[in-house]
């Protein structure tokens, strides 16, 4: 875009590696680092999965509303939602954390069960594409202070009440990194590549309840 005060640019690095473990068993990795710049930088929204059926968006506490391009209760002009980047991170809802900068790292061990065990040709799409997957994801997003800094955007909260001369800065000691691990199935069903994942999210060093995903399309 190039419209004065609404202009922005986006720089990112997307690195992927596929390591063959044995025959067609593969260990896949993806590192994504991105940054929005300019007079009107957009946001990376971290959490969820691409093409997630029955999806959910993160709902912050009512006493701590968070500015986000996907929440617009006042009905003001919100064209920025068109340029927000959704970043996959299993175990969490869409827009769990957000920022102008992002880093995510995903690992998958992919085992095509029937193709691995069978020497002959497999004619069934369902059986030929059937995969077992184990995964681990980690990521964070920020505006100013990066997650590897002692004081960062995720563990520091600034409260500025309208009409008050005081500004309160709180350190909530939150871990700026969201993590998850789990397992999943992949196959082709009715000509669609379908994924089913079960993820255990880790927030602030504590494991939370399992989260289930049904998604369409390849991951990476």
Regions found by a protein language model. Name each.
Residues 1-120, 126, 142, 156:
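C-terminal outer-membrane beta-barrel translocator/porin domains of Gram-negative envelope proteins
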Residues 1-7, 97-101, 175, 201-212:
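Solvent-exposed loop/turn segments connecting transmembrane beta-strands
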Residues 131-181:
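Outer-membrane beta-barrel transmembrane domain signature
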Residues 179, 183-188, 196-199, 203:
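Subset of outer-membrane beta-barrel
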């Amino acid at each position: 875009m190039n419209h004065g005060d609404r202009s922005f640019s986006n720089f990112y690095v997307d690195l992927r590696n596929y390591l063959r473990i044995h025959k067609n068993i593969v260990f896949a990795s993806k590192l994504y680092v991105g940054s929005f710049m300019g007079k009107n930088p957009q946001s990376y929204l971290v959490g969820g999965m691409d093409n997630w059926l029955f999806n959910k968006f993160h709902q912050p506490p009512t006493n701590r509303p968070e500015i986000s391009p996907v929440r617009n209760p006042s009905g003001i002009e919100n064209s920025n939602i068109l340029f927000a980047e959704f970043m996959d991170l299993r175990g969490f809802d869409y827009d769990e954390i957000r920022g102008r900068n992002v880093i995510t790292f995903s690992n998958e061990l992919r085992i095509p069960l029937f193709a691995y065990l069978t020497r002959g040709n497999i004619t069934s799409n369902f059986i030929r594409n059937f995969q077992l997957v184990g995964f681990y994801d980690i990521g964070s997003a920020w505006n100013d202070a990066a997650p590897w800094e002692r004081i960062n955007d995720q563990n520091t909260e600034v409260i500025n009440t309208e009409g008050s001369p005081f500004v309160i800065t709180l350190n909530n000691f939150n871990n700026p990194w969201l993590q998850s691990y789990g397992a999943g199935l992949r196959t082709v069903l009715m000509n669609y590549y379908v994924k089913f994942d079960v993820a255990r999210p880790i927030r602030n060093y504590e494991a939370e309840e399992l989260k289930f995903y049904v998604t369409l399309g390849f991951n990476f």
